[in-house]
Structure formats: structure tokens, C-alpha cells
């Protein structure tokens, strides 16, 4: 980890302690922070398929084979993560939805991911947790920043959640 990254993490920790930010992580002591983790089991339906966590959807996208993908989709949280990490998607920078390829850096993929998180936000419990963060800045410092090495960067993740939260707040 670079010095710049260490300083950034310390700064974010300070913001969290002051109550101005949330660093989303499964190991956080902050309930909203840990519940917003992609590993947390929140049931939702997306494009006709039922999921038990957003992580199962994200990890399943790495599998080209539909049967393997559906198997990953059926897992929860870390179990899905363990299965998905075996897929070498980054070699071709391609992800899949039921046999349909999507380039990692494409607008199609970005829109797909946004749509998936909006579907997750239909879950009442998830929505309440997201709204409980108020106007705090969302971070995910455990996440990677290079989109060629991760299917969802920290910036993508937090931007989508902030967008959904803002939309939900204005609907109230």
C-alpha cells in the first residue's frame, strides 16, 4: 500500500469517527457500514432471477458458462465470492449475463450494474439501511480502484449507492 493510500484511509477513518462518512465493510463496527456490504444477504429479483445477495450476482457475472453462473447466483456472500474468484474474467475484460457478453468498460455493463443495484434497493430492509446513512459520504476503502482488476470499483459502488440514496430521499 502506498503512503498516499495509507493517508487516505486514515483520513476516511477520521471522517467516519466524526460521523461524516461511512466506510462500507463487512468487518465494520458501524451497523450501516457492515449491512451495506455486498456480502450481506438481502433478497432481490433482477431480470427474472432471484438473488440472496448482490455479491452472488456480481460474482456470477464472471462465469461464461450459464450453468456455472447460475450455481454462483445461488450462493450467498462469501460463498459466491469464493466461486467467482476462480473465473479469470480479467484476461478478456468480459463479463456475462446468461450467455450474453458485456465488455467491462462498456456503457452497457455500467448500466447493467446500476440496474442491478436499483433492483436491490427494492428490498425494503436494504433501502432502510441505505437511507439511514443520511447525507454521509460513502467510501469502500477495501475495494479496488482499477476497473481492469475488479468488476466494481470503489468509485462505481459508492457513486451508485449515493445516486440511489439521493433518489430515495427525494421520493420521501
Predicted regions and their residues:
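Charged, low-complexity intrinsically disordered segments
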Residues: 1-172
Amino acid at each position: 500500500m502506498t503512503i498516499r493510500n495509507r493517508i487516505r484511509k486514515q483520513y476516511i477513518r477520521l471522517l467516519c469517527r466524526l460521523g461524516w462518512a461511512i466506510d462500507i465493510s463487512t468487518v465494520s463496527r458501524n451497523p450501516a457500514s457492515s449491512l451495506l456490504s455486498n456480502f450481506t444477504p438481502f433478497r432481490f429479483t433482477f431480470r427474472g432471477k432471484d438473488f440472496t445477495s448482490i455479491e452472488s450476482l456480481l460474482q456470477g457475472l464472471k462465469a461464461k458458462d450459464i450453468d456455472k453462473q447460475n450455481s454462483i447466483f445461488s450462493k450467498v456472500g462469501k460463498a459466491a465470492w469464493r466461486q467467482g474468484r476462480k473465473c479469470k474474467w480479467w484476461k478478456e475484460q468480459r463479463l456475462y449475463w446468461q450467455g450474453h457478453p458485456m465488455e467491462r468498460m462498456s456503457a452497457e455493463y455500467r448500466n447493467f450494474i446500476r440496474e442491478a443495484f436499483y433492483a436491490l434497493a427494492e428490498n425494503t430492509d436494504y433501502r432502510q439501511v441505505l437511507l439511514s446513512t443520511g447525507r454521509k459520504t460513502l467510501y469502500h476503502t477495501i475495494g479496488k480502484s482499477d476497473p481492469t482488476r475488479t468488476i466494481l470499483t470503489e468509485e462505481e459502488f459508492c457513486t451508485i449507492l449515493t445516486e440511489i440514496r439521493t433518489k430515495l430521499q427525494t421520493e420521501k
